[in-house]
Regions:
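Amphipathic alpha-helical linker/stalk segments
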Residues: 57-84, 124-130
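Amphipathic alpha-helical segments used for helix-helix packing
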Residues: 92-114, 160-167
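Amphipathic alpha-helical packing segments from all-alpha helical-bundle domains
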Residues: 65-70, 109-136, 143-144, 178-182
Length: 208
């Protein structure tokens, strides 16, 4: 690994550590440089400044902004969707900085956040377009389902930090989250079943 790449990783890791321990409010060039053990001039040289550094960090952390469209298997759309939403749960539950990012976004509106939202929106729309194409469903239907599921996951993970139970489900334990995942899987299976029935019905009408 080149020295520049190593230094960039150290700086990004320093940002991650500061957010995890102190929150976004503590981020500053001097604090980051000290945490990374590098000259603050390298932050300007490699990232252009604090705002660009934060923007790059945010874009690297967000789950849906970085989900690869190739993760969707046209031969097993249901399985692909289940894996994607399960991975969202795993990442959010295991990454304190990602949870802090979610909370920060709810109370902040600046250029960095807008860039993140734009990137997430573009990628999300591409994912929805792919699922719509594979299932022959209208994109608005896919978008509604994806929005409900992804937003529900984010809310439950975040509320679980403050409240241990939601509708009798333990949000602070693996058993409770397996219960949530089973519910998500059921919704996806029922939707795919409906899609298949509608598709088969249309085919039968054409062949009658």
């Amino acid at each position: 690994m080149k020295d520049r790449e190593l230094t960039q990783q150290k700086i990004l890791q320093a940002v991650d550590n500061i957010i995890a321990n102190d929150g976004f409010e503590r981020l500053g060039v001097n604090v980051i440089a000290q945490k990374a053990g590098v000259s603050k001039m390298l932050i300007y040289r490699y990232f252009g400044g604090l705002d660009d550094l934060i923007a790059q960090y945010l874009l690297s952390k967000d789950y849906w902004a970085n989900t690869d469209i190739r993760a969707i298997d046209g031969a097993d759309v249901a399985g692909s969707l289940k894996r994607m939403f399960r991975e969202q749960i795993i990442q959010l539950r295991n990454d304190v900085t990602l949870r802090r990012l979610c909370r920060w976004e709810l109370t902040t509106d600046n250029e960095n956040i807008r860039q993140l939202r734009d990137r997430r929106e573009r990628n999300g729309c591409e994912l929805i377009k792919a699922v719509s194409g594979f299932t022959h469903s209208h994109h608005t239907e896919v978008a509604a389902l994806a929005t409900i599921l992804s937003a529900s996951i984010s809310y439950l993970v975040l509320i679980g930090e403050q409240s241990s139970t939601y509708n009798g489900i333990n949000l602070q334990g693996d058993e409770g989250w397996e219960q949530v995942i089973k519910g998500l899987d059921l919704m996806i299976d029922l939707w795919i079943k409906q899609v298949d029935e509608l598709t088969n019905g249309q085919v039968n009408q054409l062949t009658d």
